[in-house]
Amino acid sequence: MSATEHTDIVVIGLGVVGLSTAAALARRGNSVVGVDRWGSGHPATSSTGASRSIRVAYDDERYVRLALDAFAGWRRLEASQDVELLVQTGQVDLGPEPKLGALAAAMRATDVRFDELDAAGVGRRFPELAVGPGERGLFHAEGGTVLADAAMGALTADATDAGAELSMPERCTAIEVAPDEVEVVTERRTLRAARVVVAAGPWSGEMLRAAGVEVSLAPAVAQVTFLDAPQLLDRPGIVDWLLDGGVGVYGHPVPGVGYKVAFDAGSTEPWLPDVEAWPPDLGEQDGLVAWLGRRMPAVEPRVALTQRHPWTMTPDGDFAIGRRDPLVVAAGCSGHAFKFGPALGELVADVADGVARDELDLFSLDRPALRTGHASPSTPISR
């Protein structure tokens, strides 16, 4: 018979959100046990890989404020763990007026400095970029790259330093909700806790459903490509919103690896819970090379590496964060949560503690999109 242990809070899933949450809760004096089926950096997980983009250019002030909090959180983590986590190159957003106007309005309202550029201005400042007469650009300095592998190591150390017990790999097999506590059954033991945070990425929907909580989540398979393009390694990150309203493209430099580019949507290929790796989609890779030829025609598109990993979409692309006592949901990261890691950890910890936050309306489990919408793996990310 497996052992039974008692703790204040169990965190299921130790990706960027789970680790950040475990650290935040432990710092507040809670006893915390975190478990993860795979372990940090495993290719089956959403938080794997060398890098993620970081930016404050969002079309909602709440996201901008959360991104600014995250920047400060990453800097504190760099100092406490004595490791470089951010490469701040700035970011340029390209696209039509309606989208860029919304980004500018949200940044202006939160006192973020940025430069607005017409097509000629983009060409002068960023000569590697080809832009059309109907396009504009926004540049802000608070953009660049999170060194994701290093960040996961730093977050693991931070949570452990705060007193959290982290167990990887340890698979959760059941969540059993009782009137005054929750039992989390793993392949090794039974954990009894007052609260449980479910931050299990694409496995979250199935876990929550089995515990009686329904959230519209769609696991998806995402793909990223790294280009061997040394001339871009000191250039800013880019988000291309595209004039035709199609799926956008983002890119950013990754020291020692290459220039990372990806479409901002998941694949239609089904995600399966026991698959550990996916072969590259060469058609998608060719599409990125074609985009590069249009946007950066002087850059020779030499592909260094293509990787795939899962993520989890909501119907509207906003996160699913909230409480269904005694469960705390931290899911539906929709392909753009990593940058917010430390800030999301504090936010989810506030949810667990019953603290009100403005951002919670945006991520509410009761918002119409989650109650009546249908999440799709290939939903383009509009954020």
What is the predicted role of each segment?
Residues 51-125, 248-249:
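Dinucleotide-binding Rossmann-like beta1-alpha1 core, especially the glycine-rich loop
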Residues 294-383:
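C-terminal catalytic lobe of FAD-dependent flavoproteins
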Residues 173-191:
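Conserved beta-strand-loop-beta-strand element in the redox core of flavoprotein oxidoreductases
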Residues 3-17:
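Beta1/beta-strand and adjacent pyrophosphate-binding region of the FAD-binding site
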Residues 5-7, 186-195:
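Core beta-strand elements of the Rossmann-like FAD/NAD(P) dinucleotide-binding domain
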Residues 27-46:
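Glycine-rich FAD pyrophosphate-binding loop
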Residues 94-162, 167-168, 174-179:
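Flavin (FAD/FMN) cofactor-binding and adjacent substrate-gating region
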Residues 23-27, 84-86, 202-325:
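Active-site substrate-recognition segment that forms the wall
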